[in-house]
């Protein structure tokens, strides 16, 4: 599934330097934001009473600078008095238990340090950052030591099924569509294989770590989110993926995202929204790509966060 693989390695986004540490409250006079830049995150904090806190995770190689470039959310967040935390935490398709704990603890520390409200927190991300968002949110809600339970969680075209990624990579190698595809698919098979083995023989290992496994309809890593608002964004442009990656619909992130939404709704998750879009996916440089931050309607998204 070149669409899934592309999100991992060849998104083509640049990285920022990441070692800056500065606090610039003077910017608040002009922008009504206090800007805090640390090694592992950036915070944009409204100077007026904060109505909500938004925590964002980028795709596999993305850091805060990339997210700002691809997802122009800061201006409307400022207008609506929403604090935004842009995390530099990346390069994760899944989270081990200790990683969930460390990340949850770090998010709580950030919220404590900057005295952010905890009654209206939203966590989400693009691509693999969506996987991180769902997994850490489920962990936070299930652990009493944390008091930063998200009110809502969202993903943007995320590769939620690790079993599917593995099997699609095998198909990509068989197709031999391009050298890039071969390299990407080999990397996926090696990475997942070294961690979990072949899913045909070790599906239980995949179920322990994956957001969702369609083959067995496993959603065990989401069960704590039954009362949490969930949005699942994707752009199922089958023509684009077939033309550019030789991918069928059943090999797209969109397919598994829709199946997940159906599964959760059947289980009684009452606040799940599946949001397919059409021709909204464009990179900041103007390139057409359905696997993009831009598929999210930002005004509608902020209104969703602020609705009572």
What are these regions (language model features)?
Residues 50-60:
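Short beta-strand element of the alpha/beta-hydrolase
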Residues 94-115:
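Alpha/beta-hydrolase active-site loop
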Residues 16-52:
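A domain-start/cap signature at the N-terminus of enzymes
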Residues 287-308:
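Catalytic active-site module of serine/aspartate enzymes centered on a nucleophile-bearing elbow/loop
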Residues 4-13:
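Sec-dependent N-terminal signal peptides
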């Amino acid at each position: 599934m070149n669409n899934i693989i592309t999100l991992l390695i060849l998104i083509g986004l640049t990285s920022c330097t990441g070692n800056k540490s500065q606090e610039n409250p003077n910017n608040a006079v002009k922008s009504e934001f206090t800007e805090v830049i640390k090694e592992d995150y950036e915070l944009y904090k409204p100077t007026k009473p904060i109505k909500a806190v938004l925590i964002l995770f980028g795709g596999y190689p993305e850091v805060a600078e990339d997210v700002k470039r691809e997802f122009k959310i800061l201006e409307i967040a400022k207008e609506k008095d929403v604090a935004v935390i842009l995390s530099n935490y990346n390069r994760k398709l899944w989270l081990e238990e200790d990683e969930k704990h460390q990340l949850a603890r770090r998010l709580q520390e950030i919220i404590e340090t900057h005295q952010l409200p905890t009654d209206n927190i939203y966590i989400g991300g693009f691509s693999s950052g969506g996987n991180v968002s769902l997994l850490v949110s489920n962990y936070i809600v299930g652990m009493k030591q944390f008091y930063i339970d998200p009110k809502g969680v969202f993903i943007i075209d995320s590769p939620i099924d690790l079993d599917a990624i593995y099997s699609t990579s095998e198909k990509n190698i068989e197709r031999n569509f391009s050298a890039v595809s071969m390299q990407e698919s080999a990397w996926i098979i090696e990475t997942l294989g070294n961690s979990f083995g072949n899913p045909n023989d070790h599906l239980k290992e995949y179920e322990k770590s994956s957001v969702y496994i369609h083959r067995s309809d496993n959603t065990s890593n989401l069960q704590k989110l039954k009362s949490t608002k969930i949005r699942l964004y994707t752009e199922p442009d089958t023509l684009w993926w077939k033309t550019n990656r030789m991918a069928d619909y059943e090999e797209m992130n969109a397919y598994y995202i829709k199946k997940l939404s159906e599964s959760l709704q059947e289980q009684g998750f009452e606040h799940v929204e599946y949001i397919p879009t059409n021709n909204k996916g464009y990179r900041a440089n103007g390139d057409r790509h359905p696997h993009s931050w831009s598929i999210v309607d930002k005004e509608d998204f902020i209104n969703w966060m602020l609705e009572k």
